[in-house]
């Protein structure tokens, strides 16, 4: 994370992140800025928050251009089970350039068994350059997912 800072006693300080988003608002498409700056997507008490949600799938696709099967792009589709287990949160990244998944062998935070990556602790969106954005996600295991993309979709499906 570049703008969301961990507190020494636990938790995260979003103040610098909110300021950063204000400073880059004009360079983000409205729907990406709306997602990034909506406190509901970060708030521990919001049912729509990614905080405490569980990753269920992270699919990397290479769809072919209908005009030429040789031309392909990278797309990532993610599905999270909401923290109250009553909804799915879908994130879709189009025009993906760089993407990384880093997971430590040992867990950073308890519980330490049979939890996969654990719950999502915090996430932030950033501007990489004109037309390219990054979404970084940190999980309780210590896993970090990073996607650089040109287009983004977000939707919620109630169960």
Please provide the spans of the model-predicted regions:
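Surface-exposed, interaction-prone regions used to assemble/regulate multi-protein complexes
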Residues: 1-159
């Amino acid at each position: 994370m570049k703008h969301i800072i961990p507190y020494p006693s636990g938790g995260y300080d979003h103040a610098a992140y909110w300021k950063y988003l204000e400073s880059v608002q004009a360079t983000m498409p409205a729907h990406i800025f709306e997602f990034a700056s909506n406190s509901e997507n970060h708030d521990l008490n919001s049912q729509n928050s990614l905080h405490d949600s569980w990753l269920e799938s992270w699919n990397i696709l290479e769809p072919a251009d209908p005009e030429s099967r040789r031309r392909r792009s990278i797309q990532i589709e993610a599905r999270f089970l909401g923290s109250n287990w009553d909804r799915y949160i879908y994130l879709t990244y189009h025009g993906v350039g760089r993407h990384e998944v880093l997971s430590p062998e040992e867990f950073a935070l308890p519980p330490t068994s049979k939890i996969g990556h654990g719950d999502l602790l915090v996430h932030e969106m950033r501007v990489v350059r004109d037309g390219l954005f990054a979404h970084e996600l940190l999980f309780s295991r210590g896993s970090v997912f990073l996607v650089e993309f040109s287009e983004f979709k977000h939707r919620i499906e109630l169960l």
